[in-house]
Curated annotation (Swiss-Prot):
Its EC number is 7.5.2.7. Keywords: ATP-binding, Cell membrane, Membrane, Nucleotide-binding, Repeat, Sugar transport, Translocase, Transport. Pfam families: ABC_tran. This is Ribose import ATP-binding protein RbsA. The gene is rbsA. It comes from Caldanaerobacter subterraneus subsp. tengcongensis (strain DSM 15242 / JCM 11007 / NBRC 100824 / MB4) (Thermoanaerobacter tengcongensis).
Length: 496
């Protein structure tokens, strides 16, 4: 096989911390390479070096056998390397065609832009990807899956031979995921090479040809996917065997903590009723758009209910804002941690204590920094958050550690009920395992938990009961003992 890319002896330091140590990577023409490792293993740093976002400290990069120097993003693009980020880099207020050709517009004589040609070429590229999008449509009106195809179209326009895909299916529906896989297979047949970053093992074994595993900035193993098992890869990634992928603890739920009766928000969901007890995990399953997140945000006061009642501890409550919900003992962990759950340019410490300022302030509202430091350090130890210091900026942390900070922020309010919306999205298997154990710990403390997840095995194995939604309505409630993927999916698509 012919290598199209070789990265040899790549090392990188941030301050005194070595994040990559003598890492090698080989990518072959017309192959899909899975780049694996826990959050913080060095995957993103390695790819940012390849794409010209960071400069390497040591090592060499070879393309088609020739040594190259990639100093910036323009260099990477010149060499045919493109990265499709987890947080898509599109301009929402521009059209599909404008985004595809941004910075590469066709210019006529006298510097006027040839929009007709741009639209024709945009439609042609999208058609080749199996997409018949209206190229005049604004990107903000597209689904995440459609936006991703626009990103891929952009990369093909610049004749990219190497595509880096970072958690490409994290926010996609099942249908969009299947469409993406078809596109990847088509690109592979055309001789394109893809580096695929994902924590979803079933995807790795379906779509990838080769693998490379990093741990703590070092190369652990690389080879062909056909030569390893799921457990082999997990052990390489975490450096140990995870005895249970889903460490469920049986519990005896206590008294009722939350009751929702006929809750309705017009245009989102209607007549939703369910109960959550102390020390119980109630899982919410359903396809994207089923209304699960909307129900959660209404309970948390983000949306105003049209009708229905909410009871806490047997008493009806009025929740008009998230502040009301927090004061009544309800916390919500958002599915979108970067835009709703955290302020990424602020520090770990500032984010963690944001919802519990009263706890660290004196009677006139002045922050007691000694108390703040003590509480933050305690949470860092309790949740095993890996950071250089409490003053580290959130965007510098790995996805798993960002999620732990968001969870810590929830726990510092001493909630009676916590709503976890996609708590393990985009984090590695080791961090997932730690969050599952934390859920068990919360159960033991008698906290009621609502778990929303698009990963069916997660809902089935962590929940005590499962509520299924379809198009804004509850279509069934299934006990843990009776639940199977087939039963849940049947109700998730509106079946009986």
């Amino acid at each position: 096989m012919e290598p199209i890319l070789q990265m040899k002896g790549i090392s990188k330091k941030f301050g005194n911390v070595k994040v990559l140590d003598n890492v090698d990577l080989t990518l072959y023409r017309g192959r899909v390479l899975a780049l694996l490792g826990e959050n913080g293993a060095g995957k993103s740093t390695l790819m940012k070096i390849l794409c010209g976002i960071y400069e390497k400290d040591e090592g060499s990069i070879y393309l088609k056998g020739k040594k190259v120097n990639i100093r910036n993003v323009r260099d990477a693009e010149k060499y045919g390397i493109a990265m499709i980020h987890q947080e898509l880099n599109l301009v929402p207020s521009l059209s599909v065609a404008e985004n595809i050709f941004l910075g590469r517009e066709y210019v006529r004589t006298f510097n006027s832009i040839d929009w007709k040609k741009i639209k024709q070429e945009s439609a042609k590229i999208l058609h080749e990807l199996g997409m018949d999008l209206n190229v005049d449509r604004l990107v903000k009106h597209l689904s995440v899956g459609e936006q991703q195809m626009v990103e891929i179209a952009r990369s093909l326009l610049m004749n990219a031979e190497i595509l880096v895909m970072d958690e490409p299916t994290a926010a996609l529906t099942e249908g969009e995921t299947r469409r993406l896989f078809e596109v990847i297979k088509r690109l592979r047949k055309e001789g394109k090479s893809i580096i695929y970053i994902s924590h979803r093992m079933n995807e790795i074994f379906e779509i990838c040809d080769d693998y490379i595993v990093l741990r703590d900035g070092c190369l652990i193993s690389q080879g062909e996917i056909s030569e390893v098992t799921r457990d082999d890869l997990v052990k390489m990634m975490v450096g140990r065997e995870l005895k249970e992928h889903f460490p469920y603890e049986c519990s005896s739920p206590g008294e009722e903590i939350l009751r929702v009766e006929n809750l309705t928000v017009k245009g989102m969901f209607e007549k939703v009723s369910f109960v959550v007890k102390k020390g119980e995990v109630v899982g919410f399953a359903g396809l994207i758009g089923a209304g699960r997140t909307e129900v959660a945000k209404t309970i948390f006061g983000f949306y105003k209910k049209t009708s229905g009642k909410i009871y806490l501890g047997g008493e009806e409550v009025k929740i008009n804002s998230p502040r009301d919900a927090i004061e009544k003992g309800i916390m919500y962990l958002s599915e979108d941690r970067r835009n709703e759950g955290l302020i990424i340019k602020h520090t770990l410490k500032e984010n963690m204590t944001l919802s519990a300022l009263k706890k660290i302030s004196d009677y006139i509202g002045t922050i007691n920094f000694s108390k703040e430091r003590s509480i933050v350090n305690e949470m860092i130890q309790k949740l095993n958050i890996k950071s250089f210091s409490p003053n580290q900026k959130i965007f510098r942390l790995s996805g798993g550690n960002q999620q732990k900070v968001a969870i810590a922020k929830c726990l510092l309010t001493n909630p009676k009920l916590i709503i976890l919306d996609e708590p393990t999205r985009g984090i590695d298997v080791g961090a997932k395992n730690e969050i599952y154990k934390l859920i068990n710990d919360l159960k033991r403390q008698g906290i009621g938990i609502i778990l929303i997840s698009s990963e069916l095995p997660e809902v089935l194995n962590i929940s005590d009961r499962i509520i299924v939604m379809h198009e804004g309505k509850i279509t069934g409630e299934i006990s843990r003992e009776e639940a199977t993927e087939e039963k849940v999916m049947l109700k998730a698509v509106g079946g009986e």
